[in-house]
Amino acid sequence: MSRAIRNIAIIAHVDHGKTTLVDKLLQQAGTFAAHQHLAERVMDSNDLERERGITILAKNCAVTYEGTHINIVDTPGHADFGGEVERVLSMVDSVLLLVDAVEGPMPQTRFVTRKALALGLKPIVVVNKIDRPGARPDWVINHTFDLFDKLGATDEQLDFPVIFASALYGYAMLDLKDKSENMRPLFDAILRHVPVRGGDPNGPLQMQISSLDYSSFVGRIGIGRISRGRIKPGQDVMVLNGDKPPKRARVNQVLGFKGLERVQLEVAEAGDIVLINGVEEVGIGVTIADVNQPEAMPHLSVDEPTLTMNFQVNTSPFAGQEGKYVTSRQLRERLDRELMSNVALRVEETGDTDVFLVSGRGELHLTILLENMRREGYELAVGKPRVVIKEIDGVKCEPIEMLTVDVEQENQGAVMQALGERRAELQDMQSDSRGRVRLDYRIPARGLIGFQSDFMTMTRGTGLKSNVFDEYAPIKGDGTNARRNGVLISGEQGDAVAYALWKLQERGRMFVSPGERLYEGMIIGIHSRDNDLVVNPIKGKQLTNVRASGTDEAVVLTPPIQLTLESAIEFIDDDELVEITPKSIRIRKRFLLEHERKRASREPAAA
């Protein structure tokens, strides 16, 4: 009855080709029937993941190779989704560490690798994209070895097997001199090097939930690895959740993975990764145990949120015109639904029923949620992100991030100066022989808010940056990153007029185009000075009977700055909001009327 099982996770930095590699493994193991059309990057299942080329949620799939069932778990490479990573690693016996043949190991690989090594997992290193011009596999392997050594790897972990691969063209090899047409060397390495760590299938059941899914049809679904015993549909189990009293429950369905499909199983046993539903109390770290001999497993920790934002009902004059879901009840229901599967998220009530305090792992984590809500037809406003301050032993502490930037040498000075102003501390600096420099910093998380757009401007789009949470440390100085420029605020409601925008161009750069609908208090551009300025963008040219309309000057407009969700959230100040609807992203002042803003600015001064 017992089948040979291997459980493996894939670790990689964003865009190092992890999801493409899984595509090829699925294809070559014969998972897709000949008549099935295979989309590219099958593991990135939602639109946002495909557009951005990043994996947000850990996903599972399985292949069968030479009679062995291999469960493959895709992990998010981005540190904002690190909450997912740790739990995934608890289900597997080894990891495939995928590194780019040009870039080498990057900080997010470092983040997950540190966790994998600490758990005692022995990695298999896959040097991917060896078909790229400029590939330098030997340099990459040396850097990977140094990284493992820095992260405290054991001698056994440092003696790692290396596979060279091109996921795009679907081949792998043990030596660069070898010829290869397929992924067979990688499959063989998995069978040879991944330990079989199955428990006793005849013992009392023990299974820990490491990941959650939600289906409107069957409710919450728990995903986890069976450590001991067997589980089958209709079985009575005990749910053990930390200090809470044990609860009896009945499993409705047991599903396994076959390719990308979920298939119903008659029975599953120790060593397999399965999904179960029908158990209401299922949650991260919960142990599903035998009714007669319930034994809890050590509880899994989840990364704490480091960034918080206010999500609130849209109160602008255009509220409810573009969105389908606009009330606080609908917002609350959507956030509650997100909490079912998005474990690193926290939602708290505030004194105001229309405002929710949402905390997450970083800017990307929260903007992905906002972008998903926007696409589903939600309309809301959000405030400026703030870091989560903790009190440790009576000292106020803030989150510190490890930041790595890879820039061209001519941009190095500007980037270092900007990071110095944001209270970053340089840890390491390496230059390669190709005119690029890699800088490692420790930086307070609040120093990173708004840094992405500045960084892209300074490096003219050629810079690479990535950051990962390191620890909480005592707050140093105020170090607030105040915006240098003021803003241009519309003083009227109506449609923007080309003539007015043309006249306003000398005052700053615009966010709006002629014909766009505006309202009083909406921010329409960046002022060239450091103060805010109320302007009239809907004022047309005054015509008299002497000056005919035909003798007009040529109106030449500079193209406006295109606002994206991330750039708008990075841009705003404490007294501003981003209005998010399915069709538009607007920036506005919290108080729309000028006299209200003046009164609000006087209140703190009076206090």
Feature roles, as predicted:
Residues 257, 262-265, 443, 453-458, ...:
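Long insertion/accessory domains within large nucleic-acid-processing enzymes
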